[in-house]
Amino acid sequence: MNGFWLAHDALVAWLSHGVLAASWWQIVIFALVATHITIAAVTIYLHRSQAHRALELHPVVSHFFRFWLWLTTGMVTKEWVAIHRKHHAKCETVDDPHSPVTRGIKTVLLTGAELYRAESKVQETMVKYGHNTPDDWIERNLYTRYSWQGVGLMLVIDLFLFGAIGAAVWALQMAWIPIT
């Protein structure tokens, strides 16, 4: 019975504090840094580098952003780029995948992820607008094929590091991009 209580106490300690036993302000700093990296990845990598080809990133930097976006958003580079390019090509028309003019600002702000998912299934959009995006082995066999497993892994990481409060950290990370 001693082993049971030892395991019980270890589980309670982990749920209470995670492996880092971080203070509340350290958890807040982590969440802010992680969400900032996600915003930078969307802005620098997806938007400037991939969608508009306005910036050439070193392959290591590009791959870091691809990996980070897989962990924190589940977004597939080709899909995001194709949808964004179509948005510019069909701006504020009924063909714009996320126009606040035709769909309403509330819809775009509150269900932007659903609009993204729906448009990502339109093969014509992917073919016409998704060119010149990564198409290597890891993109096809991990980042695209298992796009949502990345965010699942991020949940496991957050729970491991911070215990039960890691679920709140993860929820913030998942909500951050659709909100901002």
Predicted features, each with a name:
Residues 1-180:
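Non-catalytic, topology-defining segments of multipass membrane proteins
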